[in-house]
Every structure is written in C-alpha cells, then in structure tokens.
C-alpha cells in the first residue's frame, strides 16, 4: 500500500521561480489511489499499567468505555501488562508492586473479572506518596469486582504470590 505523497512546491522550482511554474509543479496527481484498510482482523491493543500512576487512571477514565465496546464487538483484543514503576512512591508499602501482583492473581484465578478489577484499581486509585491499599483491601476489591473463587484470590493476593512476577514483568518492560 502506497501512502499518499505531499508535493513540495519548492523542490523543483525553476530558475525564474514564477508562480505559474511553482503551481504547475505542486499540482497533485491522481495516483496512487487510496485503498480501504482491511478490517478482517481485530486490532491488538496493549496497555502497560502501573496502578499508582495518575496517567494510567486518566487513560482508564477516558478510554474504558470505548475499549470495552471494541472488545465486545470483536473489533479489538485488549491486553493489559501490569507493571510497578512507582513501587518506591508509597511510603515503603510497595503498593504499586502489590497492586500489580493482585491484578495477576485476578487474571490467573478469575480472568472474567479482570477488566472490572483493573477498572476498580484505577478509578479508586490512592494518591502517590501514601500507603495505598493493604493486601486485605486489595482482596476485598477483587471480591467487590465479582470474583467468584474469593478464597483462592484472597490467598493469592494476601500471600503476594505474583509480586515476584510483577517485578520481573516491570524489568522486562523497562
């Protein structure tokens, strides 16, 4: 597929530089003919998210409805990559890392509730330089997001089963 070209009116200007010469050289041509974009396959959308990042919260607030619609319409696939870039910004509690681990717990044990849990983490996000939520509060949020196997998810979150994975995922991302 050829992208349309934009003519530079000064590129091949004649020595006299007359307006007529420049206009003739800058006239667009009919080629190439644009072709419609194929819509056969869904668009693959990848979102890297730190649950303490205000930018991640703003992205979620601005785009969650549209992303959900595209996924529901099979127009897009959506993959979230929880990362913990702001681990040191929570008074030593490592909230960013623990929240990313909690998201991995929900993705592993209740994948059908991940989008709701992800949304809850971002829309009720604690402020930077605060303690953030405790592991028990994160588990309560997972339950509130509709996780059915509450005991397994709670144990996963409170035992911080996926924090090492979240740290490694963050290292890979950066």
Regions found by a protein language model. Name each.
Residues 1-91, 170:
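Extracytoplasmic thiol/disulfide redox context detector
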Residues 86-174:
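Cysteine-centric redox/oxidoreductase cores and disulfide-bonded domains
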């Amino acid at each position: 597929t050829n992208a349309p070209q934009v003519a530079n009116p000064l590129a091949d200007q004649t020595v006299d530089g007359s307006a007529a010469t420049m206009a003739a050289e800058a006239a667009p041509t009919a080629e190439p003919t644009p072709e419609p974009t194929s819509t056969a396959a869904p668009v693959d959308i990848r979102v890297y998210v730190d649950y303490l990042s205000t930018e991640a919260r703003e992205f979620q607030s601005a785009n969650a409805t549209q992303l959900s619609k595209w996924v529901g319409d099979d127009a897009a696939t959506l993959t979230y990559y929880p990362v913990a870039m702001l681990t040191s910004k929570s008074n030593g509690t490592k909230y960013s890392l623990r929240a990313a681990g909690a998201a991995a717990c929900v993705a592993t044990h209740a994948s059908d509730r991940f989008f709701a849990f992800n949304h809850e983490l971002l829309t009720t996000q604690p402020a930077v330089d605060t303690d953030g939520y405790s592991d028990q509060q994160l588990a309560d949020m997972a339950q509130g997001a509709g996780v059915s196997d509450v005991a397994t998810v709670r144990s996963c979150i409170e035992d911080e089963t996926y924090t090492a994975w979240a740290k490694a995922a963050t290292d890979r991302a950066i």
